[in-house]
Each structure stands twice: as C-alpha cells, then as structure tokens.
Amino acid sequence: MAKQIKNSQLHKGKYQWLKWLLGILCLLALLGGTVFIYILFPPVVAETIVKASDHRQPLTETPKKFGLNYEDVLIPCSEGVTLSGWWLPSPLSKPLGTILLTHGVFHNREQVLNRAVFLVGKGYQVLVFDQRGNGLSGNSPVSGGLLEAGDFPACAKYLADRRWVRQPLIYFGFSLGAISALRAGVSTQYAQAIVADSPLPTLKSYVSRRTIGAPFAWLPGFLGSCLKAYDLKTGLALTENDLDLMPVVKQIKNLPVLYITGERDDLARPEEVQQLFAHTPSPHRRLVYIPEAGHEETFTKYPIVYEKSLMEFLTDLRDGFPDARKYEEEQMKTIKLLEKQVSMKQKGHSEQPMK
C-alpha cells in the first residue's frame, strides 16, 4: 500500500514537472512570437515597401503612339522634388477644361495614359504626371498620399503660371493617385472637381492585401510597429490616423466628386469606396460601379460604362449640375446593386453581375 502511494506521488510529481515544462515552453513560444511579429518582422515589411519604391518601372510608350501632340514638362514641387509629366493640349481652340491626371503606387504615368488619350479626344487638355518617388519624378518615400497630395497643387500652379489653365480644373487620380487627389482637393483651392478611381480607405487595406505583413495586419499594434520601422528607414513619422481617408472625405462639403469602383477589386473594395462616398457631404457626389472589374480594370473592363459616366459628370460640372435629382435616383440604384453584390459574396453565393 505504501509502495502504491509512493508510486502515485512519483507519477504526480512527474506530471507536475511536465506541466511546468509545457507552460514554460508555451510562454517562450509566445514571447518569441511577440518579438518576431512586433520587433523583427515590421522592418522586413518596411524594407519591402522601400525596395518596391526604389525599383521604378521604365516608360515604354508616349502619347505619340496614339497620334497625340505632347510636351515633356518638369514641374517644381515641395520638398525640392521635381515632377515629370506630359502636357497634352486639347485639339479644340477652346478646351472644355483642364485635367491633372496621375497613377497608382509603384507605377508611372503610363498606367493612366489610356484615360488621358480618351479625355484629350473629348476636348480636354491633360497634364499626366508621375507622382513623386515614381517614374521619372524626383525621389520621395511613399507616404500614402500625404506628401503626394502636394503634387496636384504644384501642377496646377505650374499651368497657371503659364496661363495654360482652362476652367474647370479637375484633379483625377487612380488608386494612390485617387487618395492624393482627395487630400489635395480638401487642402487647396485650385480644383473645381475630383475624380477618384479606386481609392484605398486605410493603411490596413494595403498592408493586409498587398504586402508580406498580411497575416498579421489584424493584430493590435502591428501596423503601428510597421510605421515605426518605416520611419527609421525613411524619416516619415506616420500614424494609422494620418493615413485614414475617411476624415478627409468628410471635409469635402461642396466640391463635386466622382468615385469609381470595380466589382472585383480586391484592394480598394467596392463596399469601402461606397463608404467613402456615403461620408462625403458634397451635394454633387457620384459613385460609378463597374461590373466584373478588378483593381486595374475599371477603365478597360467595360469602357463604355466608364467613359459614359465620366463624361456625364464632366458635362454636368460645366453646366452646373442641372439634373441633380435624376442622379440621386440613379445613385440609389447603384448603391443597392453594390450592397446586393456584397451580400451575395458574404453568403458565399454567386450571381451574374448586371451589365
């Protein structure tokens, strides 16, 4: 009996020791994981963004390919940065307006050249430019639209100094360019309207969908750790709030804004763009929903839908938005369609999009 008790105590002591060992191993794993996620990994995420910015895509074509006259221009900007772009004059003696047009992150002006060609063909004059840190423009770290927003007023001033501006003046951007256009429209007085094609609402949208930091983007404090690591590499002291676009669009009280989103955009998701639209107080806001379009397909998937919506917006801008009530009804149809598509995705069903 005494021997059985002794054996039982030995087994209990052995299991107790194993429990302690397992607990210590779990604690070490937790500490190691925390150190990796919050200290060792954020610099890797930051470095991938810096390297992507350093690896610039070369220009492979010019407006000449499309039979357009153009002029290479260099535009002085803030922080000593010089922007590079193409000035495309209108074929009309009296241009219908002036459009400043730019691209998305880690790209160059070629990404939006198709839009520029279309707009010039419709009678507008267009300055299409490389955002700072991209293409042939001067060096600058990617700042999620904070520094890039200064590119638009710099371009507007450049044209105004040469008396090249014909009203209305429109800021037009795609992806990061759309973010920059929205920020610039709030902070400067040059623009009469904004066209925001596929804007990303937050830093989390980008990190969680386009970087190696995606698996940890949902963890509290991870994005802040990435921004601190990015600050050490670039000198940009940014916060998540700095890169939140929602407070920006809430300040757009009168400026007409055209939002464009694609049904299958996995980066600037349509429901997120719809939220930006919903929180924009301007009475002349519009939302265009392109069926089946991914992030870089809004213009090419269904060009007729894109071009028609864009020209209606620009025409109404020149005419003072005479049929505002009509478009309110159309916007409600667009929003209901978008909400239906989002609901179908969430339920795991599929449905042919409306064309």
Predicted regions located by residue number:
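An N-terminal hydrophobic leader/cap segment in hydrolases
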Residues: 21-76
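Alpha/beta-hydrolase active-site loop
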Residues: 111, 142-163
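Catalytic histidine-centered segment of alpha/beta-hydrolase-like enzymes
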Residues: 293-303
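Short beta-strand/loop motif that positions the catalytic acidic residue
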Residues: 252-253, 259-261, 265
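Conserved alpha/beta-hydrolase
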Residues: 118-138
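The serine-hydrolase catalytic nucleophile loop
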Residues: 105-118, 131
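Conserved alpha/beta-hydrolase "acid-adjacent" motif
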Residues: 266-272
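Hydrolase active-site cap/lid region
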Residues: 183-238
